[in-house]
UniProtKB/Swiss-Prot annotation:
Subunit structure: Complex I is composed of 45 different subunits.
Its membrane topology: Single-pass membrane protein
Organism: Mus musculus
InterPro entries, alphabetized: NADH_Ub_cplx-1_asu_su-1
Name assigned to this protein: NADH dehydrogenase [ubiquinone] 1 alpha subcomplex subunit 1
Pfam families linked to this entry: MWFE
Gene that this sequence comes from: Ndufa1
Alphabetically ordered keywords of this record: Electron transport, Membrane, Mitochondrion, Mitochondrion inner membrane, Respiratory chain, Transmembrane, Transmembrane helix, Transport
Amino acid sequence: MWFEILPGLAIMGVCLVIPGVSTAYIHKFTNGGKEKRVARVQYQWYLMERDRRISGVNRYYVSKGLENID
C-alpha cells in the first residue's frame, strides 16, 4: 500500500535536515554564540568589515555596544 513508503520517507527527510541544523549549531558554537553571517552583496561585506574594526579584537562576531564606539 501507499503508506509503506512513509518510514523510508521519514528517514530520508531526517537525513536531509541533519546537515543544515548541525551546521547552524557548529557556527553558533565557533562564533561566540552567534550564527555565521554571510555577505551576499558588497554592502553586507562593508557592514561585516565595520563590525570587525569596531570590535577591537579583529572579529566581526564580537559585538560592542554604542558606548564603545568613538
